[in-house]
From Swiss-Prot:
EC number: 4.2.3.15
Name of the protein in its database record: Myrcene synthase, chloroplastic
Short sequence motif named DDXXD motif, residue ranges: 347-351
Extent of the transit peptide: 1-56
Organism of this sequence: Quercus ilex (Holly oak)
PANTHER family: OS04G0344100 PROTEIN-RELATED, TERPENE SYNTHASE 10
GO biological process: diterpenoid biosynthetic process
Length: 597
C-alpha cells in the first residue's frame, strides 16, 4: 500500500505561498515602522492572564519544566581553567602531528572520519582541508578509485561530498555486474556495505546509482543484523539503520561514538583521551551559556504571566547545541535560545490560547513593530509582544555596535512572516478548514519557525554582512526552505497525534490521509519519503554556489538534523520524553568520567 502511495502522487514542488494584502485569508493592516528602540521598554502587567467567563479557550495542559532555574544554577561547572587548557593543547598538538605524519590516503581518510565522529574535527579544519585537497587532486590527476575496495571507495566519496567536493556517483559502477546490478559478492563485506550505505545519503535528485546503492545496502545490512553476528559491527549497523550519519545531530553522535570507540580493538588512547577531555571542556562552556539563558528566561516573567505556554528553557537551549556546538559561539547559542523561546511562546499564543480576534490584533501589532500600538492588546499579549520587541531590538543593537549595520527590518520581517502564517492556521482551525497537503506544506514550512531562526542565524555568525546575501535572505533561499520543510515534517511525525487531541489544524499526516484515503501508517511512510526527497534537494543546494558562509549552511543542515533527533520518539520539545531527558543529561549535565591514571 505504501509503495503505491509513493508512486501514485506527484512530488510536491513546495513553492512558497505568496503573502499579499489582497489575499483575504492573510488580510492584515499594513502599517509598518522600522523604528529602532535601543533601550528595553518596561511593562507592568495587571494580571497574569486576561480571562473572561464568556471566552472559551483551549488548553494543552503542558507540564512544568523538569529543569527549574535553581537546578540549573546549582550545576557545578568543572573542566575550566589553565590546567584543562594546557592538557587539551598538548593533546591537540599530538593529534596535529598524526595528521601531518600519516601519508597513506586510506589511513588519512580513516583518521578524518574518526576525528569527525569523536567531535574533534573542528580543531583541525585547515589540516583536513589540506588532506582532502590532496586526495581529490590526486584522484583527478590519474589516480583511480580502487574498484576492489568498496569500503575505501565509499568512505572517500562520502568525505569528499560532505566537504563540498564534486564527485560523480559513477565511481560505484565498478561494483556492478554485467546486468547493471550491484555484485552479490559485496554482501559478504559488511564493513564495505555500511560504508556504501552511509555514502548513499549524500545523493541528489536523479542519482539513480546512489538510490540503488541505498536500497541494496539497506536490505543486506538488515539481514546482517537479523543474523546477530559480530557484536561491535552489529552495533554500528543498527545505529546507522536507525539514522544515517548525515542526518544525525553531530554533538549527540560524538557522545555516543566516544563510548563505542572506547571498546574498539584499534582504539588510539591519545584520540580517546583528547575526545573525552574536549567533550567535557565544551560541555562546561555550554553549561555557562545555559545558566545565562536560564536567568534571562526567568527575568522575562513569561512563565508566570503566560501559564498556558510551554516552559522549556533547557529544551530550547538543547536545540542550539544541535545547531552550533563549538565553544567560541556562546553568544550565538544564547541568542538562539531567546529566539527559540519566543517562537515557542508565540506559537502557543496562536495555537492554544488566543482567540481569533486577539490573534488578528497581535499580528497587526507585530507588523507595526510599534509599542504604542499595543494598548489594544490583552495583558498577556502585551508582555509577550514587549519581550519579543525588546529582545529582537537588543540583538539588532548588538549587530549595530559590532558591524555598524542596521538589521532590525530583516529581523522584523522574519517575525511578521511567522505571525502571518500562524494566523492562517488559526483561521483554518476556526473555520474547520481542511487544507490539501500541498496547501498545508506551503504554509507550514514557515509556521514551523525555522526561517525565522535561520534569518537570525545569518546575522549571528556572519561578518561582514553582504548585500548579496541580504537580498537572497529576504526571499528565503532554498537552503532555508528545504531545512524548514524537513523540520516541519519531522515535527508532524512526532507531534501530530498529541496536537490533534488538544485541538489543532490537521498536520501533514492527516492532510495526506484526507486527500488519498490512506491509512495513518501509509501516510507516515509517505511523509518519511518526502523527508528523504527533501534531503536530496538540500544536498544539492549545500554544494551549490552561494552568498552564505559554510558555517551558516551547516547551521541550516543542523536544524533539520536536530528536528529529526528531537521528534524521533514523539514530542521531545513540548511534552518531553525519556529519550530527550537522557540526551540532555548526557550532553549538558553529566561529564564523561575520566581515567585519572
Amino acid at each position: 500500500m505504501a509503495l503505491k502511495l509513493l508512486t501514485s502522487l506527484p512530488m510536491y514542488n513546495f513553492s512558497r505561498v505568496p503573502v499579499s494584502s489582497k489575499d483575504p485569508i492573510l488580510l492584515v493592516t499594513s502599517r509598518t515602522r522600522n523604528g529602532y528602540l535601543a533601550r528595553p521598554v518596561q511593562c507592568m502587567v495587571a494580571n497574569k492572564v486576561s480571562t473572561s467567563p464568556d471566552i472559551l479557550r483551549r488548553s494543552a495542559n503542558y507540564q512544568p519544566s523538569i529543569w527549574n532555574h535553581d537546578y540549573i544554577e546549582s550545576l557545578r561547572i568543572e573542566y575550566v581553567g589553565e590546567t584543562c587548557t594546557r592538557q587539551i593543547n598538548v593533546l591537540k598538538e599530538q593529534v596535529r602531528m598524526m595528521l601531518h605524519k600519516v601519508v597513506n590516503p586510506l589511513e588519512q581518510l580513516e583518521l578524518i572520519e574518526i576525528l569527525q565522529r569523536l567531535g574533534l574535527s573542528y580543531h583541525f579544519e585547515e589540516e583536513i582541508k589540506r588532506i582532502l585537497d590532496g586526495v581529490y587532486n590526486n584522484d583527478h590527476g590519474g589516480d583511480t578509485w580502487k574498484a576492489e575496495n568498496l569500503y575505501a571507495t565509499a568512505l572517500k566519496f562520502r568525505l569528499l561530498r560532505q566537504h563540498g567536493y564534486s564527485v560523480s556517483q559513477e565511481v560505484f559502477n565498478s561494483f556492478k555486474d554485467e546486468r547493471g546490478s550491484f555484485k552479490a559478492c559485496l554482501c559478504e563485506d559488511t564493513k564495505g556495505m555500511l560504508s556504501l550505505y552511509e555514502a548513499s545519503f549524500f545523493l541528489i535528485e536523479g542519482e539513480n546509482i546512489l538510490e540503488e546503492a541505498r536500497d541494496f545496502s539497506t536490505k543486506h545490512l538488515e539481514e546482517y543484523v537479523k543474523q546477530n553476528k559480530e557484536k561491535n559491527l552489529a552495533t554500528l549497523v543498527n545505529h546507522s539503520l536507525e539514522f544515517p550519519l548525515h542526518w544525525r545531530m553531530p554533538r549527540l553522535e560524538a557522545r555516543w561514538f566516544i563510548n563505542i570507540y572506547r571498546h574498539n580493538q584499534d582504539v588510539n588512547p591519545i584520540l580517546l583521551e583528547f575526545a573525552e577531555l574536549d567533550f567535557n571542556i565544551v560541555q562546561a562552556a555550554h553549561q555557562a551559556d545555559l545558566k545565562q539563558v536560564s536567568t534571562w528566561w526567568k527575568s522575562t516573567g513569561l512563565v508566570e504571566n503566560l501559564s498556558f505556554a510551554r516552559d522549556r528553557p533547557v529544551e530550547n537551549f538543547f536545540w542550539t547545541v544541535g545547531l552550533i556546538f563549538q565553544p567560541q559561539f556562546g553568544y550565538c547559542r544564547r541568542m538562539f535560545t531567546k529566539v527559540f523561546a519566543l517562537i515557542t511562546t508565540i506559537d502557543d499564543v496562536y495555537d492554544v490560547y488566543g482567540t481569533l480576534d486577539e490573534l488578528e490584533l497581535f499580528t497587526d501589532v507585530v507588523e507595526r513593530w510599534d509599542i504604542n500600538a499595543m494598548d489594544q492588546l490583552p495583558d498577556y499579549m502585551k508582555i509577550c509582544f514587549l519581550t519579543l520587541h525588546n529582545s529582537v531590538n537588543e540583538m539588532a543593537l548588538d549587530t549595530m555596535k559590532e558591524q555598524r549595520f542596521h538589521i532590525i527590518k530583516y529581523l522584523k520581517k522574519a517575525w511578521v512572516d511567522l505571525c502571518r502564517y500562524y494566523l492562517v492556521e488559526a483561521k483554518w482551525y476556526s473555520n474547520k478548514y481542511r487544507p490539501s497537503l500541498q496547501e498545508y506544506i506551503e504554509n507550514a514550512w514557515i509556521s514551523i519557525g525555522a526561517p525565522t531562526i535561520l534569518v537570525h542565524a545569518y546575522f549571528f555568525v556572519t561578518n561582514p554582512i553582504t548585500k548579496e546575501a541580504l537580498d537572497c535572505l529576504e526571499e528565503y533561499p532554498n537552503i532555508i526552505r528545504w531545512s524548514s520543510i524537513i523540520a516541519r515534517l519531522a515535527d508532524d511525525l512526532g507531534t501530530s497525534t498529541d496536537e490533534l487531541k488538544r485541538g489543532d489544524v490537521p498536520k501533514a499526516i492527516q492532510c495526506y490521509m484526507n486527500e488519498t484515503g490512506a491509512s495513518e501508517e501509509g501516510a507516515r511512510e509517505y511523509i518519511k519519503y518526502l523527508i528523504s526527497a527533501t534531503w536530496k534537494k538540500m544536498n544539492k543546494d549545500r554544494a551549490a554556489s552561494s552568498p552564505f558562509s559554510h558555517i551558516f549552511i551547516e547551521i541550516a543542515l543542523n536544524l533539520a538534523r536536530m528536528a529529526q533527533c528531537l521528534y524521533q520518539h514523539g514530542d521531545g520539545h513540548g511534552l518531553g520524553n525519556r529519550e530527550t531527558k537522557d540526551r540532555i543529561l548526557s550532553l549538558l549535565i553529566q561529564p564523561i568520567p575520566l581515567n585519572k591514571d
